[in-house]
Amino acid sequence: MQEETIAGIASGMGGGIRIIRISGENALQVVGSIFRTKKYLSNLQKEEKENIIWKSDYFEKKETHTIHYGFIVNDQEEILDEVIVVLMKEPNSYTKEDVVEIDTHGGNYVVKKILNELLHHGARLAEPGEFTKRAFLNGRIDLSQA
């Protein structure tokens, strides 16, 4: 298992939906730090910000292979996009690490904003082929599949 958490765009350009994949030891926490539920945001509008605290371990308590609807926000709690998050906990993922996929709207501006937030919160940009490399190194696929 690799210690660094990586993030990268996992889908092609031009579609209405883009997928950003995050993999590694801290994938759940990195995404948890920028993901908010609709309920949380509506409570945030009703009460003082100091009274409501988001816990970045939100995904730690969730089952693997589950889908979560919500929003990606920046550090000022401004919504960047409405998203679907797919959670795949290790070892039952492509890389055999914790993997989170963010399904976001396809515009380049939004995708870059979300990717920058992930990098700001501890991920690093994945190198080309790095998700497949991790799958190979962790025994998920063999050399002929890589």
Q: Where in the sequence are the language-model features?
A:
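A glycine-rich (often HGG/GG-containing) alpha/beta subdomain
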Residues: 1-146
